[in-house]
Amino acid sequence: LDNGGNISWSPDGRRIAYIQTDSSKVRRRPVVHPTDPTYPEVTLERFARVGTPIPTLRVGVVDSEGGATQWVKLPSDPGTFYINSVSWAGNSKELLIEMLSRSRDNRKFLLANIEKGEIATAYEETDPAWIDASYSANAGLEWIHDGKEFVLISERGGWRQAYVISRDGKQRKLLTKDKSDIIARGPVDKSGGWFYYIASPKNATQRYLYRIRLDGKSDPERVTPDDQPGTHSYE
């Protein structure tokens, strides 16, 4: 068992959430490590191929001072899904769990109430081909409006765009309506009500900083000065 993945402390520091991985049923395959071309080493590493068992995953929460683990009752059978991320949902009572089907055609964000043992779907998307998880350019989910909503990057509409999702999953609002990809997300100005991002809606060889209102009631505003064409990066 590998218990070290994706550890997340609750905001109040009282709980620790983590993903437990059991790869004991995953077959091993030989891998050559040619670090020494004269005598290369061969190791056996676990690797799940199509139709063979994948690791079984579960989410646990433990008190920071020790004690028994409280396991989250996920709505799918073990060995049929992946867990991309586990984070605290803007408070110290609920977890936001990102689950992916094994075939990667379904993605869910589940809200798990640790104290009540309840779980609900906050967001779900499907695609007959492939769904990217929240990493790399799609990473950076962030809670806004006192935890009532969160900003999510998704390619559900064919472009990498930003959405505002209500906590109960009943409302979904598209922020970046241009038919172009968000190249990289920037910070969320919660007090000012802005979402910042890098994009190149008119010329793929250029990159500019844009921002848009979190309420979705404005057009994108280019922050990079108009007299500075080219590729821009910001920190």
Could you describe each region identified by the protein language model?
Residues S64, A68-S101:
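Long hydrophobic segments that form regular secondary structure
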Residues N84, S136-G140, I182-V188, T231-E235:
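Repeated scaffold domains used in trafficking and secretory/extracellular systems
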Residues D63-G67, N113-G117, S166-K170, R213-K217:
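Short loop/turn segments that connect beta-strands within beta-propeller blades
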